[in-house]
């Protein structure tokens, strides 16, 4: 997927979101937003922000490279829409700014480095809003995926004392995508979730082996544990 295609998808997503006036209608009567647990409400907007604990997995280096997570953060907006009548299933998407970081231990071939990557991300998940016996409290397991495009970042090379872009033909590819799974909890307008992203794309650039591992013939994939707070 090219950057132009990704930006076009973002534009279509934003223009497709209806303007919410804080209420919906059920059988001709207004349903106000004070109780978000009521799955008769057809849509919602939300603000999301939280912590990333990312991983970068190397395979095919004649022994996996040792990496350590560098916690970062994410922030963005989401929009959810109910699927059908009478069922508490919601399709949620949005636009998230997210940062990921990894520390790569030095080897005979590679110097010690820290990589910080910045992405614009589109999550697409199916949520099931399960009402509980407690008023205004729901449990919301979800499953879906994400698409992300790198928009910047920094790789710090400690031996040579230089900084370079983390993306390029001899570094990481900009595009990433994968599976997202987790569970959220909501009380009235307040939301919390924990989730995990499993990157399915090989993000190693086409010339990665020429500048890093001599015997590299494998893959680099991402993972990301997320803890998120929000307001709907």
Protein language model features and the residues they cover:
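Outer-membrane beta-barrel translocator domains and adjoining extracellular loop/strand segments
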Residues: 57-63, 103-110, 153-162, 204-211
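Transmembrane beta-barrel domains of outer membrane proteins
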Residues: 36-37, 76-82, 125-129, 182-186, ...
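Residues that define the transmembrane beta-barrel architecture of outer-membrane proteins
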Residues: 41-45, 67-73, 116-122, 137, ...
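Predominantly the C-terminal beta-signal and adjacent terminal strand-loop region
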Residues: 96, 100, 176-232
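Transmembrane beta-strands of outer-membrane beta-barrel proteins
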Residues: 43-49, 73, 89-93, 122, ...
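Short loop/turn motifs that connect adjacent beta-strands in outer-membrane beta-barrel proteins
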Residues: 33-42, 83-89, 131-138
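Short glycine/proline- and aromatic-enriched beta-strand/turn motifs that initiate or cap beta-hairpins
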Residues: 21-74, 78
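Transmembrane beta-barrel strands of outer-membrane/channel proteins
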Residues: 47-53, 93-99, 126, 141-149, ...
């Amino acid at each position: 997927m090219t950057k132009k295609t990704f930006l076009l998808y973002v534009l279509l997503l934003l223009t497709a979101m209806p303007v919410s006036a804080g209420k919906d209608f059920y059988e001709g009567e207004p349903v106000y937003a004070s109780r978000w647990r009521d799955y008769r409400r057809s849509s919602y907007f939300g603000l999301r922000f939280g912590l990333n604990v990312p991983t970068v997995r190397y395979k095919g280096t004649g022994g996996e490279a040792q990496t350590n997570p560098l916690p970062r953060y994410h922030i963005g907006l989401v929009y959810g829409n109910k699927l059908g009548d009478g069922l508490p299933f919601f399709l949620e998407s949005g636009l998230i700014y997210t940062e990921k970081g990894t520390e790569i231990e030095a080897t005979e071939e590679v110097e010690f480095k820290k990589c910080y990557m910045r992405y614009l991300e589109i999550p697409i998940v199916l949520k099931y809003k399960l009402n509980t016996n407690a008023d205004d409290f729901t449990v919301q397991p979800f499953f879906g995926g994400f698409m992300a495009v790198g928009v910047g970042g920094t790789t710090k090379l400690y031996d040579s004392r230089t900084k370079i872009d983390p993306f390029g033909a001899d570094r990481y590819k900009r595009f990433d995508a994968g599976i997202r799974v987790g569970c959220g909890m909501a009380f009235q307008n307040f939301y919390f979730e924990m989730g995990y992203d499993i990157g399915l794309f090989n993000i190693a650039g086409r010339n990665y082996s020429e500048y890093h591992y001599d015997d590299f013939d494998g893959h680099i994939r991402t993972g990301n544990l997320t803890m998120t707070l929000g307001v709907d």
